[in-house]
């Protein structure tokens, strides 16, 4: 009997492990993102090594994501010096389908951080690589590309960025 | 005893309130189409009498027509002109799937337009979370 319970427990636990494997974990390396920028040139996340990077997954069709863009802009401006010194960056990864909408929204909000997209909507491989179930979604990574935080927004996000940028100075 | 009466009244009030909230949606529960139903009709080629319209970011469902996000007035016009010569008895199902129903800016204006135009067999595809979780992850048929 004890053995059966033990076996059942192991089965349950392995199921849990398996489920966890499909999603991101803090402390793990962030999956590579290799996508084109708005002008069509290639870009890869690994080229940002050495910086704290906020990867913002968004789309112009996602109302809460669009609403968050001014907050990200404020964050980007607040840490403009860190950006200049190569310590901080924001990478916007759009799950848009329409290049026109994507471009227009970038212009409308005067988004001046990095923006990439393969314009494949939910079929973009990054959605799978990062296990994204819905937008908005973001990941904060450290200088080595390790995940520091998953899906933090607003004040919580800002405080963490602040903490990491200050510690590293 | 008083406590029970209070609880009873509170429950009644709340349930009335909750159903009142539901009534505010332009569709009735019976006007929701389940994804499994639509997916099996597509797979079995039984969609000839059915119009599948995307009123969101992308017409990803196989055989659907891309109207565009219905929170944009231009796309409501597009929906109007697309349906101008369609019989009011035609079975129509619309979907968006950008986000959960309560956050979606597209399904309400689109469904209201169908109602205003007098379509009697209009339905809304039941995508409570989004098109990713409720359609793509289930490997239902898509436009490629």
Model region roles, listed by residue range:
Chain A
Residues 52-53, 136:
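Alpha/beta-hydrolase fold active-site loops
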């Amino acid at each position: 009997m004890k053995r059966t319970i033990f076996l059942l427990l192991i089965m349950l636990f392995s199921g849990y492990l398996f489920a966890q494997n499909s999603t991101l974990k803090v402390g793990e390396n962030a999956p590579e993102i290799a996508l084109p920028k708005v002008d069509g040139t290639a870009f890869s996340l690994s080229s940002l090594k050495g910086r704290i990077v906020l990867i913002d997954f968004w789309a112009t069709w996602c109302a809460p994501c669009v609403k968050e863009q001014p907050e990200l802009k404020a964050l980007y401006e607040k840490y403009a010096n860190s950006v200049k010194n190569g310590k901080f960056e924001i990478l916007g990864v759009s799950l848009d389908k329409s290049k026109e909408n994507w471009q227009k929204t970038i212009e409308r909000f005067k988004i001046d951080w990095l923006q990439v997209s393969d314009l494949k909507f939910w079929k973009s491989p990054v959605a799978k690589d990062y296990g994204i179930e819905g937008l908005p979604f973001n990941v904060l990574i450290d200088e080595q590309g390790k995940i520091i935080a998953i899906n933090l927004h607003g004040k919580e996000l800002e405080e963490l960025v602040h903490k990491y940028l200050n510690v590293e100075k | 005893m008083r406590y029970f009466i209070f609880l009873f009244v509170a429950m009644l009030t709340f349930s009335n309130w909750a159903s009142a909230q539901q009534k505010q949606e332009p569709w009735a529960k019976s006007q929701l189409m389940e994804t499994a139903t639509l997916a099996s009709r597509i797979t079995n080629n039984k969609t000839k009498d059915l119009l599948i319209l995307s009123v969101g970011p992308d017409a990803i469902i196989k055989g659907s027509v891309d109207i565009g996000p219905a929170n944009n007035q231009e796309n409501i016009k597009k929906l109007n002109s697309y349906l101008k010569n369609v019989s009011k008895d035609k079975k129509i199902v619309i979907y968006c799937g950008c986000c959960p129903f309560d956050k979606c800016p597209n399904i309400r204006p689109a469904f209201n337009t169908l109602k205003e135009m007098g379509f009697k067999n209009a339905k809304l595809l039941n995508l409570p979370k989004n098109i990713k979780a409720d359609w793509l992850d289930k490997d239902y048929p898509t436009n490629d």
